[in-house]
Amino acid sequence: MEKVNSETGKIIVIEGACDGMGKSTQFELLKRRLQEDGRELVNHHFPSYGTFHGEPVVRYLKGELGEPAFLSPYMVNSLYAVDRAIAWNKHLREQWQEGKVILLDRYTTSSLIYQSALITDIEEKKAFIDYVCEFEYEKMGIGKPDDVIFLHAPFDLVTEMRNARKSNDGVPNDIHERDIEFMK
């Protein structure tokens, strides 16, 4: 597995506590700013909609794999992990090794947030978080973020913003967005 060193680029991730927070807007603003500053960058949105490796995640988000409460967080994370690993190996790794900024809309932090939310036991939750980090960064060899920008806003405001939009990259009201208690 490759190790992070000073000769590689940076990985910057924009995350949010729930969908509809304005991540895409902030992503575009940061992207524009980095470009104006002359930084070479590559950007990617996860899940990778419209790709063969993002398709299982899209099916999950549409509810075609069952209700999240009945699915193992480890299984669900595996869908996302494969998407991230293929995108990393096909598109992102080489750019990162060339010193470019990799700007990501969602990444591993999303699995840590969404899948661990369904785990009630604190020790099991910690074990899951450790598992995701080891599995994805060490075993699968994807790049570890240098910076994660985490957006937070009041739930009522986020709900209003989310309800005002038509779809989430072609997935109208995904399984998490339909579950208000989960989103809280």
Regions found by a protein language model. Give the residues of each.
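Walker A (P-loop) phosphate-binding motif
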Residues: 2-32
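Hydrophobic "anchor" residues on beta-strands that sit immediately upstream
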Residues: 11, 15, 101, 142, ...
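Generic detector of well-ordered alpha-helical packing
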Residues: 16-20, 106-107, 147, 153
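Flexible, glycine-rich phosphate/dinucleotide-binding loops
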Residues: 20, 50-52, 157
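Short, surface-exposed alpha-helical segments at coil->helix boundaries
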Residues: 24-28, 54-55, 184
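Residues in and immediately flanking transmembrane alpha helices
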Residues: 28-32, 36, 118-119, 165
